[in-house]
């Protein structure tokens, strides 16, 4: 059996899409976080790990850089993944009416310029 490629899951995330782009035939192994990806690779539970290293919107991904510094890991490939965010609501709503936005911290950081311009 081919060893899996670990990525911080769950399926459907941007890292899952990056893993599929880099390793289209899989298998893919969703794990609980960035450190779990490094642990899986170092324990040989995964052949490779896929982690974000930079965002054109939010800059360097510090946790990935920390893991590369702390552990015996090397970058052996890369892919560029276009990311689009959507601001959605339960019903019709004007941007001026938006009061609270809930999302993953990375997505909030990537959208900080738009969020700062919201009037509410």
Regions found by a protein language model. Give the residues of each.
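Domain-level signature for soluble enzymes in the chorismate/prephenate branch of the shikimate pathway
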Residues: 1-120
